[in-house]
Structure formats: structure tokens, C-alpha cells
Amino acid sequence: VTSTKWPVKDDFIFSASMKINNYFLNDQVSFGLMVRDDMYIDKVTPDILGDYVAAAPLLLTHENAPANCFARKSGKLVYGGTCTRGYKPGETVKVQIESTSDGYACTFGDETTITGGFDFKLTALDPENVYLCMFAARNADVTFSDVRLDIK
């Protein structure tokens, strides 16, 4: 995980190209961009901490219909929608998270931009900042390029 602390009052567009090099097929593998309300690095805890939105697929075992973006709000996982197809190693996709007046808009590849269910500001744990991240979880190998953080 690579992250940047960002003032919550400053609207942004966070985007990148992401090459999917390889991944182990299970429902917890994911990769993309994330915005969180707090960041935990090298912290061991049994608690599920923090809320987030992710411009990323999930449930990759659902071959042609993985989840299109996801979020965690008040400890509950929320799926943004369903992808129109599966994503395979060797593909390069665009990913983007844009702050909006009431939350975030997440886009993964050519899929529909997700805003519904992502209408919260991520200020529960840190009311001043959010944390913008690039991530690959659970045996995923991706390469990010053309990473941009634009102020709106």
C-alpha cells in the first residue's frame, strides 16, 4: 500500500493506469485505488478499523461478474455494482476516485462510475484528513503508472 494524507476540505481527482500482472483467484483478492478515513501500517489488531471507498474489483471468482467497486461504511461492506466482464492478467485498466459534494465517485476500467452507496465523507476517525492509496491485496501483482492527483 502506498498512501498520501490529504485535507478532506480539498476536492480532488485521483487516477492511474493499472496493469494487472497476476493474481490468485479468490474472493478477497483486490487491486486499485482506495480513499480511507484512517491509515494503519504495521499495526496488529483484530478489529476492523476505518471506512473506505475503493475503485477496484472484488469477488473475482465470479468470473464475468465481479463486484464493480466497493466500500466499507460503519463496518459494513457495500458493493457498488457488478462488472460487465472479468478482468485478466495482462490487461491495463484506468482507475479513478473523485471527491464529490457528498462523498466519492469510483470508476474501474470501462465500468459504470459508482456513486450510489458511496455518499459519505470518510471523516469518522480523522475529521481533517483522508488517505489516498494504491493497493494490491491477497496475492495480487499490479503495476501502477500515470498516477495523478488533481485538485478540483
Language model region names:
Residues 41-43, 78-81, 112-118:
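Surface-exposed loop/edge segments in extracytoplasmic proteins
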Residues 14-16, 90-99, 104-108:
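Short tryptophan-centered beta-strand motifs in secreted/extracellular beta-sheet-rich domains
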Residues 1-70:
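Secretory/extracellular carbohydrate-interaction modules
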Residues 1-6, 80-86, 120-122, 133-134:
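Beta-strand-rich interaction surfaces with strong enrichment in secreted/lumenal proteins
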Residues 117-143:
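Flexible glycan-contacting loops in extracellular carbohydrate-active proteins
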Residues 144-149:
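Extracellular beta-strand elements of beta-rich domains used
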Residues 72-94:
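Short, aromatic/His-centered strand-loop micro-motif at the edge of beta-sheets
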